[in-house]
């Protein structure tokens, strides 16, 4: 494949506790995800999917292993090489969750714009970018709506816009369609594929949702912390 992987994990392991209480959540997990790919992390509850997603998202420390994001090594032998992981997340990684977690007292536009303002962008420019993203995700007609007035599918599209605000090339989604019916889940997955192709992004989705399995380019299955 001509592109370098946007996400490369090499022998990632994670354990919690020590001695008799030690739990090995991940064991020597290696995988690559390339631009324009939408991939799934599958497996039963407790298999390590969310743990791996949180390590890729620079939220959780690994016990050992290495990781490169967009060609740059950020984790080596279980040690972070970047002093400011918050800035790394803010500018390189977008997060989408099962429940959209939109701020209830901000309208759709301001929910998206807030991410940009936290990164230092001027309010007017942040709102303009938010409107552009909402239009791109076909929910621009609801830009002034409060979260309580949005349908589940609309709210998740606003959450996707928020994840895209800082133009990340790596997008991590944890059960993004679990609360949606088949039609709305399909719309969300179509939009994620559009983002992957047009933005040359790598999208990793943790899911148990069988109705979206056909949307993925690749599927990685974890069992007992190992890739099956």
Predicted features and spans:
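Extreme N-terminus of proteins, especially the signal/transit-peptide cleavage junction
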Residues: 1-5
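ABC family nucleotide-binding domain
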Residues: 6-222
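A short acidic, often aromatic-flanked loop/helix-cap motif at beta-alpha or helix-coil junctions
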Residues: 228
């Amino acid at each position: 494949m001509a592109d370098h992987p946007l996400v490369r994990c090499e022998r990632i392991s994670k354990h919690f506790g020590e001695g008799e209480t030690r739990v090995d959540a991940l064991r020597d997990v290696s995988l690559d995800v390339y631009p324009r790919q939408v991939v799934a992390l599958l497996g039963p509850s407790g298999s390590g999917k969310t743990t791996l997603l949180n390590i890729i998202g620079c939220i959780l420390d690994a016990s050992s292993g290495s990781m490169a994001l967009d060609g740059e090594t950020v984790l080596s032998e279980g040690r972070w090489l970047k002093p400011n992981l918050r800035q790394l997340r803010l500018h390189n990684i977008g997060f989408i969750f099962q429940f959209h977690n939109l701020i209830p007292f901000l309208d759709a536009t301001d929910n998206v714009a807030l991410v940009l303002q936290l990164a230092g962008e001027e309010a007017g420019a942040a709102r303009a970018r938010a409107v552009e993203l909402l239009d791109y995700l076909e929910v621009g007609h609801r830009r002034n709506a409060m979260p309580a007035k949005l349908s589940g599918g609309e709210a998740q599209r606003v959450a996707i816009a928020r994840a895209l605000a800082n133009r990340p090339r790596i997008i991590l989604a944890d059960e993004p369609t679990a609360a949606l019916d088949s039609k709305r889940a399909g719309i969300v997955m179509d939009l994620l594929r559009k983002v992957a192709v047009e933005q040359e992004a790598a999208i990793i989705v943790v899911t148990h949702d069988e109705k979206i399995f056909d949307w993925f380019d690749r599927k990685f299955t974890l069992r007992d912390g190992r890739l099956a």
